[in-house]
Amino acid sequence: MTLPAEIEGLFTSLFDRATELSFDARHLIDELLDIDCTFGTMPDAGIYRLHLAATSTYRGGIFCLRVPETSINAYSLLRGLLEAWSHLEFIADAGSGGDMGCRALRYEIGATREWSNVLHAAPSYFDKGAWLLGHDDKERELQKLWDKCGCSGRLRTYGDVGPTLKVLATRPDMEWVHGVWRSTSATVHMYGTDFLLATKGDATRLVWALPSYRATWLAFLVSAYSFLSITAMKILNEDDSRIVEFHERGRALVEEPLLRQIAGQMFDEDYSLYEES
C-alpha cells in the first residue's frame, strides 16, 4: 500500500516542474517582445497581456492541485486557459482576416466592450464610476489604435471561443480541446455531481480529490498552457529555436511515466477522502 504522504511527495515533484514551466515561458515571452514595446505596440502588447493573464490562471490551477480538497478548482481554471488559447489562435490565424496587429485589436476591443456590459449591480463600497472612467479611457486608446492602423472586421466576442476550439481539436494531439472545454462547465457551474462526488453509506467520497483526477487535470493544464504559450511565442517570433526547446519541456512533463501511472488510477485505492454526513 502506498501511503497518502508518499503520493503527495510524488505529486510535489510534478507540480514543481509544472510551475517552473511557467517561469520559462514568461522569460521567453519577455525575450521575444519588441524592445520598444508599449501599450500600443500590436500585436506584441496584446499578446503580452493575454499571456500574462493566462500564466496567472495556470499557476492558480497548479496551486489548487497541491491540496486534494481544492483540486476541483484546477479543472474550472482550465476553462480560462483554453479560452485564452483560442484568442491567441485567432490572432495568429491569417485566415481570420487582416494582419496580426488588427486581429489583436479585434480581440481586445471586443473583450473590453463585452466586459463593460457585465458590471451592472456592484457592491456599495466598489467605485463603479471610477472603474467605468478607466475602462472608457482604455477603450478610447484602443479605438485610436484601430483608426490609426486602418483596421476593419468584426470584433471578436466570447461566442467565437467554441468555434475556434473546434478547429483546434482537428489538429494532431489536440483532439481533446473542445470536449474538455465543454466539460469544464460542470465544475464552473457546479452541476457535475455525478462525477465529482460518490455517496457510500453515510459518507460522500470526494471523487475529484483522487490522484487519478488530479494527475489528469495536471496533464490538461500543462498541455493547454504549453500550447497557448507556443502560439504566443510564434506570433512574436516564429523562427526562434528556443520555442522548440520550450515545447519539448512541456511535452516531456505531459508524457512523464509517473504522471501517466497516477492518471491510470494506480494509487486511487490507497487514497480516499470522505466527508461524513
Model-based region annotation:
Residues 1-277:
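A cross-kingdom marker of C-terminal helix-rich interaction/assembly modules
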